[in-house]
């Protein structure tokens, strides 16, 4: 089987061979090529010790030298090059306590997580597939290399990766592999929240998010990482594939304070957290609007940048479009109608001068009153109308 090797990768492999060492393109990049997908990156395994890798290439970074990994830079493009190795015990369910560098590619591939990631290829020896990974690709099956219980005890993150690959590729999970996930599910607590966030996000953003979430539930992993009353429904696959919308969908049953706590715990960034909270807290307010003013207030509550994602979540759950809301929102936004105090045709300083009032609580109340009147379309957004309304408000206060 011939596989096209990118120029930079070929240069790295050829450099090792010219200097008496072996090297292969390995892992997920070969899986992706065999599935006619574009690899995100290319990893290389070699019989050369890491110090030799550093000598053979001009620009390198010792990213994981203690485990044999050197990043080689070719025209600023990074390629991870790792020495063939076996691994010692895993006392933390994440990283080996020790590694031993070896010269046998088959022994190196035997430590990989899944058969579909245990490939090696170069144009001298062709495709090496010692663990029937190609068969499992054709069977659309996620299966551990060797003993699945051992694989998951070595690295508990592999359990989330199995389900993530299943969702991304629309593959089933081998029965023994899935059974081992159930048995070892509690050990996911040994994995950092950041790594859990990354895998959960990839599952949620896949084309088969519902299937992935159900597998997380059935495997007992979900109760370990998100033990809450989540909204698990197949309509999630219709939700816009951005992480804020997908998270908001599964968190619809939860109070905003709990959503915030969960997202902080999982180390989500502040912008994503705020958007998810806006979407979940505003969902109950979306309905066929009684007036344009109601629609404006919905936009104000959820934010201009989030309103169409909110509509999309509503449409996904109800399996119907809501053109009356969508069209009204578009009309409001396209015509730049007043939504915020800053949109008013008058400023706080104008009111201070015209009405001889002092900055403070009364000024804030006055500006909010003017905004409500404009939103309700009881007055126009022009200077004269706003001043008249403001004077009346002050007189009646």
Enumerate the language-model features and the residues they cover.
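Catalytic cores of the polymerase beta-like nucleotidyltransferase superfamily
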Residues: 1-397
């Amino acid at each position: 089987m011939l596989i096209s090797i990118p120029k930079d990768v070929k240069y790295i492999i050829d450099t090792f061979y010219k200097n008496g060492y072996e090297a292969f393109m390995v892992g997920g990049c070969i899986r992706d090529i065999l599935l006619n997908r574009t690899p995100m990156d290319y990893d290389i395994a070699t019989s050369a010790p890491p110090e030799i890798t550093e000598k053979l290439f001009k620009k390198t970074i010792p990213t994981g030298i203690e485990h044999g990994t050197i990043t080689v830079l070719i025209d600023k493009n990074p390629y991870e090059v790792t020495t063939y190795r076996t691994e010692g015990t895993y006392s933390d369910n994440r990283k080996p306590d020790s590694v031993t560098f070896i010269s046998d590619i088959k022994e190196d591939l035997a430590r990989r997580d899944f058969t579909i990631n245990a490939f090696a290829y170069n144009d001298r020896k062709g495709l090496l597939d010692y663990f029937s990974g190609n068969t499992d690709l054709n069977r659309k099956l996620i299966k551990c290399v060797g003993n699945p219980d051992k694989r998951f005890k070595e690295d508990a993150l592999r359990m989330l990766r199995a389900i993530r690959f299943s969702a991304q590729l629309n593959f089933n999970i081998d029965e023994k592999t899935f059974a081992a996930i159930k048995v070892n599910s509690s050990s996911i607590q040994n994995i950092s929240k950041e790594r859990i966030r990354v895998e959960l996000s990839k599952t949620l953003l896949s084309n088969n998010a519902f299937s992935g979430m159900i597998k997380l539930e059935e495997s007992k992993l979900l109760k370990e990482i998100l033990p809450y009353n989540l909204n698990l429904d197949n309509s999630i696959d219709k939700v816009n594939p951005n992480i804020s919308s997908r998270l908001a969908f599964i968190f619809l049953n939860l109070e905003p304070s709990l959503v915030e706590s969960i997202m902080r715990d999982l180390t989500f960034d502040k912008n994503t957290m705020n958007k998810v909270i806006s979407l979940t807290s505003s969902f109950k307010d979306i309905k066929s609007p009684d007036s344009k003013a109601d629609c404006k207030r919905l936009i104000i509550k959820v934010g201009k940048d989030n309103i169409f994602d909110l509509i999309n979540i509503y449409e996904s759950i109800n399996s119907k479009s809501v053109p009356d809301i969508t069209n009204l929102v578009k009309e409001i936004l396209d015509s730049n109608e007043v939504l915020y105090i800053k949109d008013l045709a008058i400023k706080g300083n104008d009111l201070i001068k015209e009405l001889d009032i002092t900055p403070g609580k009364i000024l804030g109340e006055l500006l909010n009153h003017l905004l409500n009147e404009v939103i309700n379309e009881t007055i126009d957004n022009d200077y004269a109308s706003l001043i008249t309304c403001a004077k009346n408000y002050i007189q009646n206060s």
